């Protein structure tokens, strides 16, 4: 018999729906009292410890989720990804970000060709170039060393590398290697972002990395042209060849722009933007800042999880477990959001990156076969490091909406601080909150407990915590380059698991196209109105009104201005 077209039509899905009612009637206070249950919901791999015992689930729930995974052919879909099959069916592409961190002697094929040698050709080129920049053998147009780097890109070309950069900044080895150097990321087309990025930098000591696969991305190329003008106005047009390099596959446009094609670093159609941090997109700027050896450890960490994901049985497979639990929370328990709460300031850019990886991947309304989904899929992801988030949005998580939480802790701080006479050190203070918050969410506080504490009657409703709010805890031993790579890969594969089970294409992003095409029409109107005085036409009443107000308020903007760069 043919498999159902939608996962929700399978017996495994219906079985979980029937199972749901019993779970809803059981409070986490009761579930957490079952030591055997809790122990069965703890998994460890390579000193990464996952505790999902505070999920609204029992061992039977997990078994039923495994059956759902089987009904969705999860293992076969994972294998197809690793085998280079064109699982991105709407764009007819392989999905092979795992090849970006594979060892040199690996064989991972796309369209019958082993792509790993191509990957390592680029990695070797990055190592050579970054070494030359860092040791001063590659210098700028005026003979000065290039100590500062601005990486120009948007979306996946920005959020992933920024996450890794921020996480590495205070790692002892990485920070030592980065001494005297600066790495900045220019993403937004807003001129304020340009102004802030070039503020305090000297064009003579600055290298610009332009990241655009096609070299046609509107925002990125406008920012690249702006920085080209910043460099050439200070150093002359020939300086561009020494101060700008590219990550792109469009060599003719790279050369036309003024960048030496020998200084273009390739990546491939089988790398999606949000999965590209392990390609030249991230490896080049990160190697310029921290040295290739540090970045190679990051790649090795990601690869270790790639191996774990592809080979570990589901009951011990961290990304699979996380993905299945997300499906359970979203599609069955009806919780649309997820809070990513790292108790490490070094991970402050994790949530924004995973927000893109998750929401751009799984924010789909139809199946991979084009059928409308009759169930909720995708998650609204947000987060903030602890304990900052506790003084921000935790109020809602404790007493408002139920939002499943990922608590991420690190056993050993990158930068320990000890003060004589304090009850605990700074990291212990942080971790006290990491251990306390999941229990506060799970157990809550009852009116009876408050009465026993002699809380005033009129305050009891306000101080009651219902509890029964799910979370999971991930404990990392350290936060060095290797562990950062592992954490990245765990979340990447978790997102893939969700998409594989929901039966959607997690590797296209057609939702970003419509707004871009409409912006082209607006851009044409703004040009016509400023240069030729054309009236605003062809828009609905609301947009026409807004555009007219904008044009009237900016009537002093010259139609054909001379170049003006930020002055900050």
Swiss-Prot record:
CDD domains: SIS_PGI_1, SIS_PGI_2. It comes from the Eukaryota. GO terms for cellular component: cytosol. One of its GO terms (biological process) is glucose 6-phosphate metabolic process. It is an enzyme of class 5 (isomerase). One of its GO terms (molecular function) is carbohydrate derivative binding. It is found in: Cytoplasm. It catalyses: alpha-D-glucose 6-phosphate = beta-D-fructose 6-phosphate. Coiled coil: none annotated. The active site is at 360 (proton donor), 391, 516. Keywords: Cytoplasm, Gluconeogenesis, Glycolysis, Isomerase. Its EC number is 5.3.1.9. Pathway: Carbohydrate degradation; glycolysis; D-glyceraldehyde 3-phosphate and glycerone phosphate from D-glucose: step 2/4. The keyword Cytoplasm applies. InterPro entries: G6P_Isomerase, G6P_Isomerase_C, Phosphoglucose_isomerase_CS, SIS_dom_sf, SIS_PGI_1, SIS_PGI_2. Belongs to the GPI family. This is Glucose-6-phosphate isomerase, cytosolic 1. The lineage of its organism: Eukaryota, Viridiplantae, Streptophyta, Embryophyta, Tracheophyta.
């Amino acid at each position: 018999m043919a498999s159902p077209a939608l996962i929700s039509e399978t017996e495994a899905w219906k079985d979980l729906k029937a199972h749901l009612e019993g779970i809803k009637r059981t409070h986490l206070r009761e579930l957490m009292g079952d030591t055997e249950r809790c122990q069965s919901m703890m998994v460890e791999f390579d000193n990464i410890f996952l505790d999902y015992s505070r999920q609204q689930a029992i061992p039977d729930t997990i078994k039923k989720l495994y059956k759902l995974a089987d009904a969705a052919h999860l293992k076969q879909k994972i294998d197809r990804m690793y085998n280079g099959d064109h699982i991105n069916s709407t764009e007819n592409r392989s999905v092979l970000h795992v090849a970006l961190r594979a060892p040199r002697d690996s064989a991972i094929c796309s369209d019958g060709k082993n792509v790993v040698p191509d990957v390592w050709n680029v990695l070797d080129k990055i190592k050579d170039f970054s070494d030359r920049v860092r040791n001063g053998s590659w210098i700028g147009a005026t003979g000065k060393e290039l100590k500062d780097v601005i990486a120009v890109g948007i979306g996946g070309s920005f959020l992933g590398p920024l996450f890794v950069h921020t996480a590495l900044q205070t790692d002892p080895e990485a920070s030592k290697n980065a001494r005297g150097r600066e790495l900045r990321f220019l993403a937004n087309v807003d001129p304020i972002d340009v102004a802030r990025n070039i503020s305090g930098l000297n064009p003579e000591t600055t290298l610009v990395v332009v990241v655009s696969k096609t070299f046609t991305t509107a925002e990125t190329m406008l920012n690249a042209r702006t920085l080209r003008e910043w460099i050439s106005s200070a150093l002359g047009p020939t300086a561009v060849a020494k101060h700008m390099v590219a990550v792109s596959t469009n060599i003719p446009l790279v050369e036309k722009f003024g960048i030496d094609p020998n200084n273009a670093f390739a990546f491939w159609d089988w790398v999606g933007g949000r999965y590209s941090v392990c390609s030249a997109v991230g490896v080049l700027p990160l190697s310029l800042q921290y040295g290739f050896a540090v970045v190679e450890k990051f790649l090795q960490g990601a690869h270790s999880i790639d191996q774990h994901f592809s080979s570990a049985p589901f009951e011990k497979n961290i990304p699979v477990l996380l993905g299945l639990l997300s499906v359970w929370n979203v599609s069955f328990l009806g919780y649309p959001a997820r809070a990513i709460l790292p108790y490490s300031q070094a991970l402050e850019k994790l949530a924004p990156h995973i927000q893109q990886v998750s929401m751009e991947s799984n924010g789909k309304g139809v199946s991979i076969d084009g059928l409308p989904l009759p169930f909720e899929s995708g998650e609204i992801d947000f987060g903030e490091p602890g304990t900052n988030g506790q003084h921000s949005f935790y109020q809602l998580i404790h007493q408002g909406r139920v939002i499943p939480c990922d608590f991420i802790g690190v056993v050993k701080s990158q930068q320990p601080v000890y003060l004589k006479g304090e009850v605990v050190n700074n990291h212990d203070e942080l971790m006290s909150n990491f251990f306390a918050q999941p229990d506060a969410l799970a157990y809550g506080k009852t009116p009876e407990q408050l009465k026993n504490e002699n809380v005033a009657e009129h305050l009891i409703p306000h101080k009651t915590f219902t509890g029964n709010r799910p979370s999971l805890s991930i404990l990392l031993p350290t936060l060095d380059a290797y562990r950062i790579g592992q954490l990245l890969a765990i979340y990447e594969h978790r997102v893939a698991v969700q998409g594989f089970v929901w039966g959607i294409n997690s590797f296209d992003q057609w939702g970003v196209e419509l707004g871009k095409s409409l912006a082209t029409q607006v851009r044409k109107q703004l040009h016509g109105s400023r240069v030729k005085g054309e009236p605003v036409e062809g828009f609905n009443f609301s947009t026409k009104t807004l555009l007219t107000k904008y044009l009237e308020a900016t009537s002093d903007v010259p139609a054909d201005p001379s170049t003006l760069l930020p002055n900050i």
